[in-house]
Amino acid sequence: MERPHRRSAAEIVKGEQSVLTISEADVERLLDPQSLIDGLAEGFRALGRGEIQTPDRPEIAVPGKGFMLSMPAWQAGGPMMVKMVCVFEGNLDLDLPNHLALITLFDADTGMPVCVMDGTYITAIRTAAAAVLSVRELARRDAKVATIVGAGVQGRQHLHLLPLVRDFDEIQIYSLYPEDAENLAATAPNARAVRDVEAAVRRSDVVCLCSHAYQPVIEADWVRPGTHVSSVGYTPWPGELPQDLIRRNTLFVEDEAAFRPQPVGCAELDGLDLSIAITLGDVLNGTAPGRTSSGQITVYKAMGIAMEDLVAATLAYRRAVDQGEQASARF
């Protein structure tokens, strides 16, 4: 029987490929926050079992302007993903977001691109959703008062997601810019702006640090026994989270890579040994303890990992496909 002719590599061209494009507005429409939190929990479990590839993220720095990171990830059974994220703090003066991102999904069988989507909203909501997942897993069940330090993008996302995991009586919002705190507090019925961050932290059961501060925004002695503290700020040393708070209490991280030098790891963990930390995946898999007493202070320090982007982007893409959305670009 004659074998069919197989073209040589030199004869094969990619040709036009239909690619779904998803705008920032459509990503926001497609992503359900509760599904994202639950999806991230599964993602952390898989990461803890070694089932997700997340190579270290390389950085391109533009002196005096900002930097760009490349964040790839893949889990068997799903698409490959890469997010390109730019952090340019000066954009705020130009009325532009200081975090901008673009995500591309690739078919894991062929390597062909299948979707290009905005990653700016995904970066914002997945960061907050992972931190709020830490609240779900590590905060006391009877937590009633939360404080958010920072009234920017992360402060807003935290305010909207925290009620999904605890029934808070009150959420306090502090910002160096009181008007921003007032405006954000007005968007939620049980939120209020505060001017005294120390007093707010001292009466809190949950404290969420959501700033761009290059220095600690709270002091370790303000945090009362039984509190859960989360920190999502990503800045150079020493960062928003005081290191003595980390040293004195129980630390939880997304991944052991958090202890590597930036841009991979967290500035606040510089000089600390990774043996002091427990990964969120190990807690969720039951291979390490979470909260062990009502008086324990738990601390979650986020670095932001590509697994979170993979989970969020895959959720948005699959929902778009399920809703019959058609490819809108050809390459």
Regions found by a protein language model. Name each.
Residues 213-228, 241:
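Rossmann-fold NAD(P) dinucleotide-binding segment
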Residues 138-145, 167, 224-225:
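Short helix-loop-beta connector
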Residues 151-152:
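Glycine-rich Rossmann-fold phosphate-binding loop(s) that bind the pyrophosphate
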Residues 189-204, 218-221:
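Short acidic low-complexity segments
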Residues 232-288:
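Rossmann-fold NAD(P)-binding glycine/threonine-rich loop
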Residues 2-3, 8-124, 132, 142, ...:
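N-terminal ligand-binding/catalytic initiation module
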Residues 315-331:
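Phosphate-binding loop/pocket of nucleotide- and phosphate-handling active sites
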